[in-house]
């Protein structure tokens, strides 16, 4: 069967940052161009300015036939193309959209294969002969923004400036209404071109995108996903198409309160400082004049100053700093994000990205960021029904919130998950029970830990009791320690809730109690190295997880195969030899009225490049060219390797990423958890359920006649053929909103 490749270029008054579905649903959104190609044929283009030209008619016919015949249709970012087809295609061109099952996504193939999920970066990464046209982004900025071109051009003829601005506001797209002469010129990318030249370049850019996308897909064809992973991609399309239902009327009310509170805080800040809160440089200078000890106003510095040097600020300085902190409360920004992303029917679509996490394949979230919604405190959680009733009745205001509950931003952020609801209906809210703590011992074959679950023990409570902390802390400590986290990994997320001494104690206690897990860290690291040294063969880390190193096209890579048969891909892997060294020095401890004592203080383990012998390590220290100088003597050293691969670093940046045994075990554990969740969601769909929300080990579904919570849980817990004896269990509830922690 042939495959068609397609790329849309569109225009809209809606901001694309509101998500593809919200953008496409806007009545102003129209298709400007689309390029389509069958297999290896040259792309043909439909264009809005010449819809009846032979080429446009051919492109339209090809698209109609592909849809009618059920032929696979490939695009780089199917989330966008599917949304445009859902809302715009029939409205503008009279064509019913393709079935979701027809879509194939090259961006998903990039994510699954370890390549960058950007067409330009993927083409560069794969060293293709065809590259994305770099001027394209600038051309999109001109032709897709319905006001941009008018901004770039001077008023035409004797039209007055005020009339030109009116034309800009009311015209759907000036170039399409023949309101701008084709021979006018504008500045772009350091040069000038006429509107006609720009439009022709835009059409060429659209053609080229199809060519480059097709080449990326061809290059990655040897890494095509398995049928199960493809089924997961199609499930993800259906789930995103269903959308997450949100209470838009209540969101609007809270958004109004947030804006009012922001205005109030900004007014107070101006009264104290004479500045707007957004004037960061001026605000820093003002605060320094009132005792602020930091050198910037970034979140980390401000938090450090408030913790250590707050008393150095005078009264006005403290008030101003507190207001800036309140205004920067990030969690409350989910409310406007949910408003912006909501489609006209009150559903947020396209918020989940399948295979968004490179090292696990887990879903990630964009827009409202559902995966990190603020967890309400116990006190607030009990009050949520009351607060929500006041909100629905229109009786909530910032003054009342402050008096009854505290900081309005804190309260509104705590409400964010409760806006996920279907008016007049209930939803299923289900998550797997202690799933990571179950998967890890199952992967490494540790029956001792698995027996605890079979006996119904709460492993997080066991850790909490051993350390004298609550269950939440026990869970955090357990999850961090089991993946080779050191005391800092425990201390940082828990902050003031745990001391450094207790964090060290927790790590030592976990490692002593779980030698099988500690051994597995080394086994996973060693298996990576064995695979690198012996390419083309599979090397077992455990009975459930194995590694292989492939040097074949499209790039060298380590594959970590999970129980489901799915591979986590690590491009351009390496294992660099290093020496781990520990140092000590004597510290004199003086206590008033007592004889001074000498205490030995040890460093944490530090790394040195290369495999060094004791004499080389000592020589390195003696050179005095490193941070190691303050230490007096070496107390231990051993040789190991530092593992690295090429991957996602942060935001849109890609580069060298370091990994290690515990991190690999974490990827295997969380990746297997995702496979369980995906398998369960697909099974739930087969039983007639409609999952619309997934986060890590949690899923939400609609309640409807003929469906039950028990059946939804049973479907999610269906044991797959690739792990039939796994002790999978889940907890769930039925409520009017998303509530589960």
What residue spans do the PLM features occupy?
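Conserved "right-hand" nucleotidyltransferase catalytic core of DNA-directed polymerases
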Residues: 1-9, 14, 114, 129-134, ...
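A short acidic-Thr-Gly-centered motif at the start of a beta-strand
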Residues: 1-2, 63-67, 410-426, 682-687
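Gly/Thr-rich phosphate-binding beta-strand-loop-beta motif of the actin/hexokinase/Hsp70
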Residues: 2-37
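Active-site-proximal helix-loop-helix substrate-binding element of RNase H-like nuclease domains
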Residues: 29-31, 36, 40-64, 68-217, ...
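Short active-site loop/helix that positions an aromatic residue
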Residues: 79-92, 113, 284-289, 433-448, ...
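Conserved pre-motif C helix in the palm subdomain of viral-like polymerases
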Residues: 208-214, 433, 662-682
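Short, conserved charged micro-motifs
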Residues: 706-712
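A common structural junction motif
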Residues: 716-724
């Amino acid at each position: 069967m042939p495959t068609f490749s397609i790329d849309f270029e569109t225009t809209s008054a809606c901001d694309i940052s509101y998500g593809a579905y919200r953008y496409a649903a806007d009545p102003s959104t129209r298709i400007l161009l689309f390029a389509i190609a069958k297999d290896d044929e040259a792309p043909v283009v439909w264009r809005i300015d010449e819809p009846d030209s032979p080429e446009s008619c051919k492109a339209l016919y090809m698209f109609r036939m592909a849809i009618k015949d059920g032929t696979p249709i490939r695009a780089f970012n199917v989330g966008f193309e599917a949304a445009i087809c859902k809302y715009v295609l029939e409205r503008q061109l009279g064509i019913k959209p393709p079935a979701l099952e027809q879509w194939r996504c090259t961006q998903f193939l990039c994510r699954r294969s370890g390549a960058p999920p950007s067409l330009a970066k993927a083409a560069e990464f794969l060293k293709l002969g065809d590259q994305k046209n770099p001027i394209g982004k600038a051309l999109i900025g001109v032709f897709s923004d319905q006001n941009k071109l008018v901004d770039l051009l001077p008023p035409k003829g004797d039209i007055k400036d005020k009339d030109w601005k009116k034309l800009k506001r009311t015209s759907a797209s000036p170039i399409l209404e023949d309101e701008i002469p084709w021979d006018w010129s504008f500045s772009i990318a350091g040069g000038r071109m006429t509107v006609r030249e720009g439009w022709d370049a835009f059409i060429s850019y659209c053609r080229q995108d199809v060519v480059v996308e097709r080449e990326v897909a061809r290059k990655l064809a040897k890494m095509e996903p398995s049928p199960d992973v493809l089924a997961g991609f199609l499930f993800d399309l259906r789930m995103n198409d269903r959308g997450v239902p949100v209470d838009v009327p209540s969101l609007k009310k809270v958004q109004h309160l947030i804006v009012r509170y922001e205005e109030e805080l900004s007014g107070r800040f101006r009264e104290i400082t004479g500045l707007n809160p957004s004037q960061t440089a001026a605000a820093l200078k003002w605060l320094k004049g009132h005792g602020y000890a930091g050198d910037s106003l970034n979140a980390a510095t401000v938090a450090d100053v408030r913790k250590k040097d707050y008393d150095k600020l005078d009264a006005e300085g403290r008030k101003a700093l507190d207001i800036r902190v309140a205004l920067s409360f990030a969690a409350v920004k989910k409310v406007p994000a949910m408003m912006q992303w909501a489609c006209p029917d009150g559903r947020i679509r396209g918020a989940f990205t399948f295979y968004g996490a490179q090292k696990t394949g887990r879903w990630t979230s964009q827009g409202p960021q559902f995966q990190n919604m603020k967890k309400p405190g116990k006190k607030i959680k009990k009050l949520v029904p009351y607060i929500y009733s006041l909100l629905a009745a229109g009786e909530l205001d910032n003054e009342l919130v402050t008096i009854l509950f505290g900081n309005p931003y804190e309260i509104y952020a705590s409400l964010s998950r409760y806006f996920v609801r279907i008016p007049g209906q209930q939803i299923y809210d289900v998550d797997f029970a202690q799933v990571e703590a179950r998967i890890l011992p199952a992967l490494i074959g540790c029956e001792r830990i698995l027996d605890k679950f079979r006996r119904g023990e709460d492993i997080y409570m066991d850790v909490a009791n051993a350390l004298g902390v609550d269950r939440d802390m026990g869970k955090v400590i357990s999850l961090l320690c089991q993946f080779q986290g050191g005391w800092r990994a425990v201390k940082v997320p828990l902050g003031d809730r745990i001391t450094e001494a207790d964090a060290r104690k927790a790590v030592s206690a976990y490692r002593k109690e779980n030698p099988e897990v500690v051994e597995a860290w080394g086994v996973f690291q060693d298996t990576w190295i064995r695979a690198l040294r012996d390419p083309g063969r599979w090397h077992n880390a455990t009975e459930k997880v194995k590694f292989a190193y492939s040097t074949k096209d499209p790039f060298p890579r380590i594959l970590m195969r999970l129980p489901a048969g799915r591979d986590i891909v690590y491009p351009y892997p390496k294992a660099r030899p290093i020496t781990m060294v520990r140092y000590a020095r004597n510290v004199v401890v003086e206590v008033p009225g007592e004889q001074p004592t000498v205490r030995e203080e040890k460093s944490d383990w530090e790394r040195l490049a290369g495999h060094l012998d004791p004499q080389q390590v000592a020589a390195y220290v003696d050179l005095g060219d490193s941070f190691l100088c303050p230490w007096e003597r070496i107390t231990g050293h051993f040789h190991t390797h530092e593992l690295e691969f090429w991957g996602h670093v942060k935001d849109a940046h890609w580069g060298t990423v370091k990994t290690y045994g515990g991190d690999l075990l974490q990827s295997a554990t969380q990746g297997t958890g995702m496979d369980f969740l995906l398998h369960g969601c697909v099974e739930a769909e087969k039983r007639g359920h409609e999952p619309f929300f997934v986060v890590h080990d949690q899923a939400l579904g609609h309640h409807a006649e003929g469906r039950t919570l028990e059946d939804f849980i049973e479907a999610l817990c269906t044991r797959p053929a690739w792990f039939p004896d796994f002790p999978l269990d889940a907890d769930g509830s039925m409520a009017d909103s998303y509530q589960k922690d």
